[in-house]
Amino acid sequence: MELDGRTIFHVDVNSAFLSWSALKLLEEDPGAVDLRTIPSGVGGDVKTRHGIITAKSIPAKKYGVQTGEPVVKALQKCPQLVLVPPDFETYRKYSRALMEILARYTPLIQQVSIDEAYMDLTDRIPFGDREGALALAKQIRDHVREQLGFTVNVGISVNKLLAKTASDFEKPDRTHTLYPEEVPAKMWPLPIGTLHGCGKSTAQKLQLIGINTIGEAAAADLTLLQSVLGQKSGAYIWNSANGISRSRVEPEREQAKSVSNERTLSEDITRDNYQTDGVPVICMLSEKVAGRMQKSGLTGQTVTLQVKSSDFERYSRQMSLPDMTDRASDIEAAALLLADKLLNGPDGLFESGISIRLIGVGVSRISEKQIHQMDLFEWANRNEEDENARRAEEKARRAEEKARRAEEEARRAEEEARLAAEKARKAEEEIRRAQEETKQRAKSARQARLDEMMNKVNSRYGSGTLKKGNKKDNNQDGN
């Protein structure tokens, strides 16, 4: 069957991290305020006023709070903003629960991040049965809301690209369609930066040549796009703008010699959004790899982190662990360390201005798990690993504290500059007053000398004589 004859859903959780944090708080205290109903956000620390916002509520959005901005800036916009720390363990729990529900409708599921997945429902919804597709989407939304307590958007189309775009339309708890004939009206008027797979740097390059909307990219000459973006990227943008995508929904498959997962990102990852968009994906992929290994009774020792750039070039780093493992925490720690070196290091991709469109995590040197009693030496090794992890966490904390102090020093420097400017203004004002007083004293002195001269004249000739003489002189001047 041709791809255009398929029925594809894209399911996306509304404000995932914020919703899941709210649900956890309500589980712990049913009388607690629902974070989704008040100005709130995930990330950072309200006491230290450092960190960034990784998720926000709809009420917080009304104050202009934005995902990815510093906490201190968000609190300036909304002083009553309630902040909670991220809890990836809770997020993984709700993510797994969501995927279990989706799996009841079809086995053809491709999870692309911790809070979104594609579903191929062609076998369940015959092509052309659009009313049936809408009804099933509502059923899925209701199922998730009633059983798990949060809401999702569902986008429907004939391919993954259009389904993903549709799910990003009005939120929350909505179903949207974007069939090929709807593309000109629904997708083409959108800003070019909203096109799936078009990152910030790509959008800026297109805007420089006058392409500001998706429709303008769709109507552009393909060779022009390729000359600006490169052969592969130019073709990708042109096809995407015209709603063309041949990417299939690809369920997870076990691999014999390694276990890996990779995800194409909804937008390019740069240094600016790595913490908010990149780290959660790496954590989710590590969890998925560990889950598959545990399910199959496997352990592994080499962790690989792989990325694909916006120009479709692949880069990877790998490291071997001291021991075989199937633990998500071990895989995640190694993957994050590799990502930090590959992306954020002095010679990292971000330093070179390269953005990332795909992330993959894998474990190799696989073997079947051996069940045995852990001896004293293994306990010592594990304790040493825990100590190393603690030290790494402490190092990260010190780095964050250093950044906070730098921010505070910058703030003090700014305040000192303001005070210096105020001092200079006051000095200038004092100089102006002194000049004014000098002028006034000079004027008074001149007046005093004039009065003294008048007094001398009057005392010598008499005041009446002077006035009469003046009158005579005036009459002479008038003749």
Task: Spell out what each predicted region is.
Residues M1-Y236, E387-N479:
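Gly/Gly-Pro- and Ser/Thr-rich, intrinsically disordered tail segments characteristic of DNA damage-repair
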Residues N14-A16, V46-R49, S310-E313, I366-K369:
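Short, charged/polar surface micro-motifs in flexible loops or helix N-caps
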Residues L305, V361, G462:
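Hydrophobic, well-ordered secondary-structure elements that form the walls
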Residues V307, G362-S364, N475-N479:
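Amphipathic alpha-helical surface "interface" segments used
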Residues M324-E408, R412-E415, L419-E422, K426-E437, ...:
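C-terminal hydrophobic structural anchor segments
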